[in-house]
């Protein structure tokens, strides 16, 4: 059987595709390809995408989240979810409130560093990793940059060049 071209999602189509995926997974796979391969780089709002999806536990770790600004309640009540999403780019996210609330199987160390202005209220409540905030730390000014990767890389390179120049002048 031919393989579907993976979905290239935006804020609207991701919700349509997820709804189909839950109501008729075979049809969703035939239409959009496997959920693990969906192209999500154009999505900015992932709020509640898997809200109350108590049986969801598929691998979406390769999703491109670099443009996402809201993950509010993304896995709210997704009590079976325990996949590694630590590789997600979350530099642009400003709202993670209740992101994993009652995702009671979730026990991953995410390793994310986010700006101290990111809304994290109840983000990890009732998860197995709540006591450690699932490895998420907040830092004033964030830890990266929000923008196209080339711009962020240029900023880091410029900062490194300045530091090397300062050392050379000592």
Task: For each feature predicted by the language model, list its residue ranges.
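Negatively charged
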Residues: 2-151, 159, 164-170
């Amino acid at each position: 059987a031919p393989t579907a071209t993976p979905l290239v999602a935006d804020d609207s189509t991701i919700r349509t595709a997820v709804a189909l995926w839950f109501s008729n997974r075979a049809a969703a796979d035939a239409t959009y390809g496997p959920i693990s391969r969906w192209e999500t780089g154009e999505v900015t709002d992932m709020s509640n995408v898997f809200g109350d999806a108590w049986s969801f536990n598929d691998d979406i770790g390769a999703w491109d989240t670099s443009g996402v600004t809201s993950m509010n309640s993304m896995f709210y009540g997704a009590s079976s979810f325990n996949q590694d999403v630590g590789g997600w780019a979350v530099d642009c996210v400003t709202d993670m409130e209740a992101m994993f609330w009652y995702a009671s199987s979730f026990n991953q160390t995410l390793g994310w560093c986010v700006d101290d202005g990111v809304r994290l209220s109840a983000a990890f409540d009732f998860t197995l990793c709540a006591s450690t905030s699932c490895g998420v730390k907040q830092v004033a000014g964030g830890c990266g940059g929000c923008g196209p990767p080339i711009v962020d890389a240029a900023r880091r390179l410029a900062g490194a060049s300045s530091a090397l120049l300062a050392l050379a002048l000592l």
